[in-house]
Amino acid sequence: MTPEHLPTEQYEAQLAEKVARLQSMMAPFSGLVPEVFRSPVSHYRMRAEFRLWHDGDDLYHIMFDQQTKSRIRVDTFPAASQLINTLMKAMIAGVRDNHALRHKLFQIDYLTTLSNQAVVSLLYHKKLDEEWREAATALRDALRAQGLNVHLIGRATKTKIELDQDYIDERLPVAGKEIIYRQVENSFTQPNAAMNIQMLEWALEVTKDSKGDLLELYCGNGNFSLALARNFNRVLATEIAKPSVAAAQYNIAANHIDNVQIIRMAAEEFTQAMNGVREFNRLQGIDLKRYQCETIFVDPPRSGLDSETEKMVQAYPRILYISCNPETLCKNLETLSQTHTVSRLALFDQFPYTHHMECGVLLTAR
């Protein structure tokens, strides 16, 4: 695979290899055959980052070969959304001959939605001034005149200039309901929107007969919290990143959801609060004992759950675990399988044509 060519004819084979690999990894914990959710074979990534290469008068996006570290020119990127591909050409055309926009520009980041909105961030090794703002405003207006719903941001050391806003609003159809998700530039969002819809619908399906409340750790912008709210009396969710918490609060209001409470704290801190080890001002006014959480949802970083959180989640009758790294999932399962059994297993092909896998398990208490 190269950035400008996807081996779409190999999609089925690479997916089958992942299914076999996941089943083998999970064999010590479950004999289940994974439920498999396929990705679109192209134009599935909703965000992308590129370095810029200045070659005389020419200017173009580049990526680096993971093995050799050599530069690869990228004029089209079929893994990314159609909108990103359109913007890549338009941005180069708009920046190449404009000194204020081109000088010391070293990276462009693209974030797009299925609803055809985009935020484009230009990163510089220089101070950004009024001349830059005027040039960027003219470029933004020219892009909009082409029918592109785009917002531009300039970034430099300790500087961020938003011409109007640093977010876009995604609208995802999830099990018969449209959910609005505010996505903030430079904050985590699910890269594969089509796969995200399938993950949300799978999570809804496996929790459809739930009782009581849901506790969620690592909730981000409320991606899963908002979708799962319809299956539970209440949802209590934690997240540490301020922009993600702000986006989650907006999303709760925008979707008219009244049973989700977001707390800004790390999963490790929440574990301490639940165990009575520490008290936190951020929890004032929230009576944790009022929540009857029979299900806990975790979508941890690649490192998986730390040992204290492992112990904490074992106290819940049901654990829904989404993992972007099956190796750390299996490491966690060495502990979790002492008290719980794997009752559902799914593979989500979030990252086609790579060795990376995303998977989900539902664990029920023995």
From Swiss-Prot:
The active site is at residues 324, 358. Its EC number is 2.1.1.-, 2.1.1.35. Signal peptide: none annotated. GO terms for molecular function: rRNA binding; tRNA (uracil(54)-C5)-methyltransferase activity, S-adenosyl methionine-dependent; tRNA binding. S-adenosyl-L-methionine binds at residues 190, 218, 223, 239, 299. It is an enzyme of class 2 (transferase). GO terms for cellular component: cytosol. It catalyses: uridine(54) in tRNA + S-adenosyl-L-methionine = 5-methyluridine(54) in tRNA + S-adenosyl-L-homocysteine + H(+); uridine(341) in tmRNA + S-adenosyl-L-methionine = 5-methyluridine(341) in tmRNA + S-adenosyl-L-homocysteine + H(+). One of its GO terms (biological process) is tRNA methylation. Keywords: Methyltransferase, S-adenosyl-L-methionine, Transferase, tRNA processing. Belongs to the class I-like SAM-binding methyltransferase superfamily. RNA M5U methyltransferase family. TrmA subfamily. Dual-specificity methyltransferase that catalyzes the formation of 5-methyluridine at position 54 (m5U54) in all tRNAs, and that of position 341 (m5U341) in tmRNA (transfer-mRNA). This is tRNA/tmRNA (uracil-C(5))-methyltransferase. It comes from Salmonella paratyphi A (strain AKU_12601). The lineage of its organism: Bacteria, Pseudomonadati, Pseudomonadota, Gammaproteobacteria, Enterobacterales. The gene is trmA.
